[in-house]
Structure formats: structure tokens, C-alpha cells
Curated annotation (Swiss-Prot):
HAMAP family: ATP_synth_gamma_bact. PROSITE patterns: ATPASE_GAMMA. F-type ATPases have 2 components, CF(1) - the catalytic core - and CF(0) - the membrane proton channel. CF(1) has five subunits: alpha(3), beta(3), gamma(1), delta(1), epsilon(1). CF(0) has three main subunits: a, b and c. Pfam families: ATP-synt. Increases 2-fold following exposure to low pH. Keywords: ATP synthesis, Cell membrane, CF(1), Hydrogen ion transport, Ion transport, Membrane, Transport. GO terms for molecular function: ATP binding; proton-transporting ATP synthase activity, rotational mechanism. This is ATP synthase gamma chain.
């Protein structure tokens, strides 16, 4: 058999094997996607309830404080509130009160630990570099908490200040895995490492679509605190034991944990969806390549057979 035919056969066998591998990887990603997608949907409901509860608790205390001082309840007055007047000195007020003269912004950025996930990692990195440029243009220092080795390595190579990094998060992350990340993020904020913290990740929309998302985590503001007095009477009545500070001391760290865990779970779901799509595309390309190579092989065989028949006929004619 001519060398060209043998080479085509080897290529076909190699591409078929690659196609089997990518199809297996697609199936694994689909299985992981199914697990994280279901958990993500359930957890989103829980996280929304935690957020709503904290929003109402803070709002009710702010509204009561304004009432006691006969100050009108409007967004302008609410934006000027000093939360130490409402909650006293301590972690509760520190986690709620916006900082003045913000000099440093922290970003908790979630990427993956590996490639073969389409544009998942590159999209996050591209968006983050644009955000970093905007922050620096405003005279603010940027500090990054990187979850995922791809982002951490890229940022360090590009002279971004990475103050914390975490890799090896499970494909189906557990709540316990997130606790050290949350603890570090809160501690750095309270210690003044940064004046505000944003969580940046890829939000899973569906199997074919995702969206880059940036959420402010600390200080905990903009939780629908701007309520009307009528809404305050209707929605924000609480019987609190032993006191609001004690309740918020429990809820605020829970909110931080919920925000970060929800972001990582959502990001992992988007990563699995992107991986599944990428592997499906790779499998389809492998099948197309096998089809094209098989066509070339058949044509080469046909040409070889035609040549051999022509040679036989020519030889027979020469003997006559």
C-alpha cells in the first residue's frame, strides 16, 4: 500500500481516538453541569432570602433611627446615615458603613484551574483587566483575591497585586471549602487591606449562554435600604431577640459566605457548561475531519485502482 494511503489511515485512526476522548470529556462535563446547575438554582433561592432579611433588618433600624430624630425618610438622608449611630461601634457598622476616600479596591475573581473550557477564563480576565484600568484611572490601588489558578497566574504575570489565591476548588464545591476564602476576605476588609470588595465571576444563564457579573460584597450597602415610610410600616416590623446587633452579627458573616459560595457555585456551573460546549464542538470537528479524511482516502484508493487497471490493460495490449 502506498505511503500516502497509510498516512491517511493513521490520521483517521488518530482523529477518531481524539474524538472519543473529547466525547468522554463532554459527557463528564454534562454530568457535573447537571449536579451544579440543580444546586445553583436551589441555593439562589436561599441566598435571596438571606439578602432580603438583612436588607429589611438594616432598613428597619435606619428608618427607626431617622424617626427618632424627626428626620424625613428619603434616599438623600439615608445615604448620609452614619451606621455607628444606629448600630454602635463594632463589626456590624464596619461591614455596613461605606468608607470615605476609597484608596484601594479589592476584587475576588473566580476563574478555573485548567483550560479546555472555551472562552470561560479569557472572558473573565479580559473584563477584569478593563476594570483594573478604570480603577487605576481613578487613582485607586487594585488588590486581587484570586480563586482559580488560571486567573492567579495571569494576574501575577501582568503585575497585578494578588494578595490571596486559592486553587483546587471542587468541581461541585461544598460550603466548607468556601469558609477560608470568606474568612480571609472579611478579615482583610476589616484590617484595611482594601476599602471595598467586589466579587467578579461568570454567571450561568443556560447551557449555551453566560454573562460576566460584578457584585459589591463589602461594605454591605445598596440592599434596598431606600424605603418609603409606608413600606417601612408594612414590611419592616420585627420582634428581635436579644437585639438587632446580635442578630446581624450572625447574619452578616452568613451573607458574606452566601455571596461568595453562590458566586463560586454559579461560576463552576458556567465553567462546566462552557467545557461541555467546547468538547461538543471539538467532537463535531473531529467527526467532520474524519469524514473529510475518509473521502480523501477513498479517492486515493480509487485513483490507485484506476492506475493499476490502466497498467494491466496497457500490459495486455503490449503482449498482443
Amino acid at each position: 500500500m502506498p505511503a500516502s494511503l497509510l498516512e491517511l489511515k493513521r490520521k483517521i485512526a488518530s482523529v477518531k481516538q481524539t474524538g472519543k476522548i473529547t466525547e468522554a470529556m463532554r459527557m463528564v462535563s454534562a454530568s457535573k453541569l447537571n449536579q451544579t446547575e440543580n444546586r445553583d438554582k436551589d441555593y439562589t433561592v436561599y441566598n435571596d432570602h438571606v439578602r432580603k432579611t438583612i436588607s429589611h433588618l438594616i432598613s428597619s433600624q435606619v428608618v427607626d433611627s431617622l424617626r427618632e430624630r424627626d428626620i424625613s425618610i428619603d434616599k438623600n438622608n439615608i445615604s448620609k446615615i452614619d451606621y455607628t449611630d444606629v448600630f454602635g461601634l463594632g463589626i456590624t457598622a464596619d461591614m455596613i458603613q461605606p468608607r470615605k476616600n476609597i484608596k484601594t479596591t479589592g476584587f475576588l475573581v473566580v476563574t478555573g484551574d485548567r483550560g479546555l473550557v472555551g472562552s470561560y477564563n479569557s472572558s473573565v480576565i479580559k473584563n477584569m483587566m478593563s476594570i483594573f484600568d478604570d480603577e487605576r484611572a481613578q487613582g485607586r490601588e487594585v488588590k486581587v483575591l484570586a480563586v482559580g489558578s488560571v486567573g492567579a497566574q495571569f494576574f501575577k504575570k501582568n503585575n497585578v497585586n494578588v494578595v490571596y489565591e486559592k486553587d483546587g476548588v471542587s468541581d461541585v464545591p461544598t460550603f466548607d471549602e468556601v469558609l477560608p476564602i470568606v474568612s480571609t476576605a472579611i478579615k482583610m476588609f476589616l484590617n484595611g487591606v482594601y476599602d471595598q470588595l467586589y466579587v467578579c465571576y461568570t454567571h450561568h444563564v443556560n447551557s449555551l449562554s453566560s454573562a460576566f457579573r460584578v457584585e459589591k460584597m463589602l461594605p454591605i450597602v445598596d440592599l434596598d435600604i431606600g424605603v418609603k415610610e409606608a413600606e417601612a410600616h408594612k414590611e419592616l416590623e420585627y420582634d428581635i431577640e436579644p437585639d438587632v446587633n446580635s442578630v446581624l452579627m450572625k447574619l452578616l458573616p452568613q451573607y458574606a459566605r452566601s455571596t461568595i459560595y453562590g458566586a463560586i457555585l454559579d461560576a463552576k456551573t458556567a465553567e462546566h457548561a462552557s467545557s461541555m460546549t467546547a468538547m461538543q464542538s471539538a467532537t463535531d470537528n473531529a467527526n467532520d475531519l474524519v469524514s473529510n479524511l475518509t473521502t480523501k482516502l477513498n479517492r486515493a484508493r480509487q485513483a490507485q485502482i484506476t492506475t493499476e487497471i490502466t497498467e494491466i490493460i496497457s500490459g495486455a495490449n503490449a503482449l498482443e
